[in-house]
């Protein structure tokens, strides 16, 4: 089963447009995922980059990003040398286990050390995804929409009561001034080992919470 480097954007947004503008997905910059461009130039000429120039029937056309000789792809990222009408996206195997890891900084004065350690976790591959870092206002605002929507749609709360209850809840679950959120992926053993290492490194700096699908299901059931 395959997946690709998605963003958190709405489903109506442009996949190619985001990558051409050097957008970022959950697993890193999306410019690295796009190759084999079909481009209409200002002269009306249609060019295909990489091995797509060999034709769509070639086994190399959609499977390898690098052709022979210089790569033209970079001309069309955040550029106006032509209009990209189609492209290939790099796919990746879906990992058998995925968990979210939330790190809540204990002392705001250690923010610099916190960011440095998060960067090391990413470089060493312990954190598989891009890690979001948010202050309290951002964290609570992000949670409020989901909580109020759930309370209204599934618990029959009025708009006012849903807002009141959600505000109480976010004060409990997101009280810290700075929080990060990232993901760990892999097989069961890899994920367990990564969580153990992250807890060991971060125990003095942050409170570590591991969020699984099962834990979310329990939370929704309780609500």
Language-model-detected regions and their locations in the chain:
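C-terminal substrate-recognition/cap domain of FAD-linked oxidoreductases
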Residues: 105-107, 112, 119-223
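FAD-binding subdomain of flavoenzyme oxidoreductases
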Residues: 2-124
């Amino acid at each position: 089963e395959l997946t690709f480097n998605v963003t958190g954007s709405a489903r109506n947004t442009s996949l190619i447009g985001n990558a051409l503008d050097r957008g970022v997905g959950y697993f890193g910059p999306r410019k690295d995922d796009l190759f084999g461009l079909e481009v209409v130039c200002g002269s009306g000429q249609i060019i295909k980059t990489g091995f797509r120039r060999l034709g769509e029937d070639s086994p190399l056309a959609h499977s390898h990003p690098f052709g022979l000789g210089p790569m033209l792809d970079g001309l069309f990222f955040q550029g106006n040398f032509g209009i990209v009408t189609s492209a290939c996206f790099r796919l990746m195997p879906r990992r058998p286990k995925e968990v979210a890891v939330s790190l809540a900084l204990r002392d705001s004065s250690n923010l610099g050390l916190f960011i440095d350690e998060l960067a090391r976790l990413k470089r060493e591959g312990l954190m598989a995804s891009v890690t979001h870092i948010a202050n309290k206002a951002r964290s609570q605002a992000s949670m409020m929409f989901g909580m109020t929507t759930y309370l209204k749609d599934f618990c029959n709360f009025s708009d006012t009561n849903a807002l009141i209850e959600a505000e109480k809840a976010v004060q409990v679950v997101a009280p810290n001034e700075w929080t990060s959120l990232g993901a760990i992926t892999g097989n069961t053993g890899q994920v367990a080992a990564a969580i153990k290492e992250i807890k060991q490194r971060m125990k003095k700096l942050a409170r570590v919470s591991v969020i699984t699908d099962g834990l979310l299901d329990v939370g929704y059931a309780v609500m």
